[in-house]
């Protein structure tokens, strides 16, 4: 899309390029005070920007879109587009007096479109709920914007977006009109890729989608210009015509199956491997890659050579011309001419000059001995070929466009972008420039554009090494100047006279000069036209008219550059053909007329006059005798390198001319006498010649021809100073001389001939005086012009010197100010550096202190955790060892009793039970010690105590009475309220890593023995709490009623007081105590008072009824045993009452015979309550005795749960 040759959006009518409103930006330098005053006057709010117009400038195809798309574009501008950031930049630049940067860039537009598409895709709406037309419009704009940027990844993404549009249109039938936009966008993408054939096919598909409909949706917004298309179909036809012309215009390969047809032009691509160029008589140029030409020739013209195409019909379809030239290029800049056909009706070029001269000299000889007649009338173009092309014009255009133009653009660029600012901007826009210049132009004379933009060793980029194309690219990408009215990719209209438009036009002429003009040359008319346009551009850019005149007037030798300097200006190596052309000019080889006669100048003035712009007069030569062959030979000898025979003829001519010049310099009083003598001698000589030999006639004709040829040369050298009347006079002289040859030597004829000869000499003298006068006049004018130029140069130099002095003083002041600023900054930096060092030292010392503290605290924490675990271990082992000692004492006592009574089964069962308890306690001691030691070792290794699993404290041993009943094989009897319970004192769980007691019951430590696990009072959890998430709330009134039943001798108030004391002693709550535990605690509180009341009643009984003891002779003598039996009976009666009225401890509801279950330990529960408890816990909720369920051990007697 960056090619200047692509003009897809420009109409063929030149009036279309002109717009009614001219936007000419003039930057005037203003003083600082005036700028400050303007800053105060400018309002804070930026002026509104026409968003649609800015988008049209960036995306040119929008102007050709149908009317039905623009509502969606306006919706995008109103809802999803914002110019706030751009307007701030515009306001800032306008306040600073700089040129305003374009309000919209292609990158910013692509970013906005991406955000809008992302918002639509992020919504969770269905395809029927979103605005499909708006979504398709955004996809189309995004694809066209990516096509405008024309990167490789952008082309792939644009192709995907157009494919998404096609899929969405096929799914929703309401947006079929957008299908033409899909093919239109794909056609634009193909054009950007130089794939014009594919683009043409896509445009035709878009045209087919529209069909013959008259829908207003496809109309284009009306404009003032009547030549612009009014419908989208007309716009497509214009694109089709432009694409067809580009297929022929662009120098791309004409082979249809060429794989590289989508690449850049052949002449502009520096990586091609050779090409062929065919030109016909109608100036059609067709290009083929070298490989493609071989394939094409073998396919359609097998066995034919390249020279066989000479004279054949043009390969371009519809062209009636014939092939006249074929070029082959293997290396860039070196062209080989395979064949070239020269026709009589064509102009002679530099290449076919030799062939034309040979054709002229190969005329057949005639036997007629007739004196040749010379016709000095001007000739037409069709009779004798003349020179059409002059590469002198080419080099003058090369100098003014590439050398002078590049210098002017560099000067403007340096003023707007100094080297320091340029380096900063290049670093900012490095990502933007890298895809264009990082891998191109590897054969650049200075190493490539990327090497120039980003030189090594952190040097500043030098703009004096930038060529014109690179300067244009930097102006475009760095936003140095505003974009032209139609953007950077379109040819600016004639009404656009901005700097950016002129620079763009200058680059266009550069491309034309190095492609078309270099290959085909140009005429004088084309040279004058291009010179006028380029001069206007350079004058607007700031170049002086005197410098332009100097370039045009000076010869090539004075303005030529060497090979290396010209390579820097061109940006690429100078082609070989240009080098050969320059060498020819520098050696002094100039174009000559077709007659081949050498110009012999009388004075040095004639050479100077010829170098400026010598006109070429055209004459027709009628060849009718053998004398013409002699003339042609003389011409050939003079025009080419002189041989031995031609040297003599040239000397004779020079002697004749020297004699003639001497005669002209004689005084006027001797002219008549000399003319009479010469006339007499001439007449006598003619009589002798006519009488003796015919050869003398040839000599005379040669003499006359020499005079006439001198007259022709002099007239040509005098820039047409010899008028047509003078030529008629010469013609009359020749006719008179020829008439004299045919007379019979009469005296009248002799006199007539003498007068004519005298008239001829006088005319010649007149011309000599005219030449001298014009020479003096020209030299005087030249001196005056030189004086004026020198004065102008002196004035300009004085101005430059004054400007340089002012600038130097200003720069010196700036240098001093910068030095002071640098010094202040250095002082501030040193001060801050010292502060930073102090802060760094303080921070390092603080960090070191805190690290030491952290290490000390870590070691202390480790030691504390180890000590904590050791204390826990020793405390737990201490109580277990005390339990072990008590158990051993009990075992020794029971063993002693069993030894004294060997037949007692009760004592044997007691011995076995105490042995099992001792073994269980010892296993628990070993297990606890092992677990604590393992945790201590892990803490020492670095593990945190909070991350370690809690230590499981073993439960206390079961009750010995239960074990005795199990060993005896009897059903268990409910344990007494006054049975002592062996428990391990529990420790408070201070550390989160240790749990005091296990919630789940552990398996028995000895096989074959079922252990009961009475829960400690402080940590007992009610069974219902295990089944339910909330703790069991005991009904206060129900507990009081049951205590009244258990202790009938106590009043309700006394039982309430005892229960309140028990609640206070257990943390204001008895929710964790079972009913048996509550009864046991209350009995311990009632026992002291009961003993006191019994003593009082005993004393009263002994005194009141003394015969009471005698009535019972069988009573035991021990009061304690009696008391015990009475207690047992009382307990038995209370148990019977409790068996009838005791509730279920799980749900605290009354028991009924229908759903009653009794465990082996004689505790009763509801069947629906105890079964879930046993499935989860496996122990009795009251005594913690391990119970086997029938499902686990069907044959075991303890697994039966009898029902009452």
From Swiss-Prot:
**Which residues form each disulfide bond in the chain?**
none
Q: Report biased composition (Basic residues) as residue ranges.
A: 659-668
Q: Tell me which InterPro entries the record gives.
A: DZIP3_RING-H2_finger, HEPN_DZIP3, TTC3/DZIP3-like_helical, TTC3/DZIP3/RBM44-like_helical, TTC3/DZIP3_dom, Znf_RING, Znf_RING/FYVE/PHD
Q: Where is the composition biased (Polar residues)?
A: 1099-1126
Segments carrying the region annotation (Disordered) are: 1-22, 640-681, 1088-1141
Localized where? Cytoplasm
**What reactions does this protein catalyze?**
S-ubiquitinyl-[E2 ubiquitin-conjugating enzyme]-L-cysteine + [acceptor protein]-L-lysine = [E2 ubiquitin-conjugating enzyme]-L-cysteine + N(6)-ubiquitinyl-[acceptor protein]-L-lysine
Q: Which domain of life is it from?
A: Eukaryota
Per the record's keyword annotation, is Nucleus included, yes or no?
no
Which residue windows does the record flag with biased composition (Basic and acidic residues)?
Answer: 649-658, 1088-1098
Keyword Coiled coil assigned: yes
Q: Which GO terms describe its molecular function?
A: phosphatase binding; RNA binding; ubiquitin protein ligase activity; zinc ion binding
An example of a Pfam family matching this protein is TTC3_9th
Where does it mainly reside?
cytoplasm
RING-type zinc finger locations on the chain:
1144-1184
Its annotated pathway reads: Protein modification; protein ubiquitination
* EC number, as in UniProt: 2.3.2.27
Among the record's GO biological process terms, what is one? protein polyubiquitination
| Keywords annotated in UniProt | Coiled coil, Cytoplasm, Metal-binding, RNA-binding, Transferase, Ubl conjugation pathway, Zinc, Zinc-finger
Q: Which GO terms describe its cellular component?
A: cytoplasm
List each coiled-coil range: 746-861, 906-941
Query: Tell me, how does this one assemble?
Result: Probably interacts with DAZL.
- Summarize the protein's role: E3 Ubiquitin ligase proteins mediate ubiquitination and subsequent proteasomal degradation of target proteins. E3 ubiquitin ligases accept ubiquitin from an E2 ubiquitin-conjugating enzyme in the form of a thioester and then directly transfers the ubiquitin to targeted substrates. Able to specifically bind RNA.
From the Swiss-Prot or TrEMBL record, give the protein name.
E3 ubiquitin-protein ligase DZIP3
Tell me what organism the protein belongs to.
Mus musculus
What's the name of its gene?
Answer: Dzip3
